[in-house]
Swiss-Prot record:
A GO-annotated cellular component: nucleus
Organism for this UniProt entry: Oryza sativa subsp. japonica
Family annotation (InterPro entries): Rhodanese-like_dom, Rhodanese-like_dom_sf
Reaction catalysed by this enzyme: [glutaredoxin]-dithiol + arsenate + glutathione + H(+) = glutathionyl-S-S-[glutaredoxin] + arsenite + H2O
Protein name according to UniProt: Arsenate reductase 2.2
EC category name: oxidoreductase
GO molecular-function terms, A-Z: arsenate reductase (glutaredoxin) activity; phosphatase activity; protein tyrosine phosphatase activity
Rhodanese domain boundaries: 18-119
Keyword list, A-Z: Oxidoreductase
Gene: ACR2.2
Enzyme Commission code: 1.20.4.1
Function: Possesses arsenate reductase activity in vitro. Catalyzes the reduction of arsenate [As(V)] to arsenite [As(III)]. May play a role in arsenic retention in roots. Possesses phosphatase activity towards p-nitrophenyl phosphate in vitro.
Length: 130
């Protein structure tokens, strides 16, 4: 199980996204509806994140690395990543999660660096965005 939260850059994340054992968790609140998102990401808004921890655990079953982000990854992304790590530490169930990471500079940094974004309205995003 993951022992701590680490950070990953957008450049490092791009090749990681090809691995089916990676999940991206977007914890932005309403701005995700209006902005784009990383294709295939799971959306668990920070304002209700604590209540949805078991749901996230189920949705990411079999994943080894979870990468959390908000707009800037300064507050919501890191705090939700830590909350999920604490949840896994206290949960009675087995977890495949070995790494919990936060995307440096968040979604805004991802988009500003020219990384691909998805503008679909699917929930959850199926990851086949153009």
């Amino acid at each position: 199980m993951a022992r701590g939260v680490s950070y990953v850059s957008a450049a490092q994340l791009v090749p990681m996204l090809r691995d089916p054992r990676i999940a991206v968790v977007d914890v932005r609140d309403e701005e995700r509806i209006y902005d784009a998102h990383i294709a295939g990401s799971h959306h668990y808004a920070s304002d209700s994140f604590g209540e949805r921890l078991p749901e996230l655990a189920q949705a990411t079953k079999g994943k080894e690395t979870l990468v959390f982000h908000c707009a800037l990854s300064k507050v919501r992304g890191p705090s939700c990543a830590q909350m999920y790590l604490d949840y896994l530490s206290e949960a009675d169930e087995d977890s495949d999660v070995k790494n919990i990471m936060v995307l440096e500079r968040g979604f805004n940094g991802w988009e500003l660096s020219g990384r691909p974004v998805c503008r679909c309205k699917d929930a959850p995003c199926k990851g086949v965005c153009s």
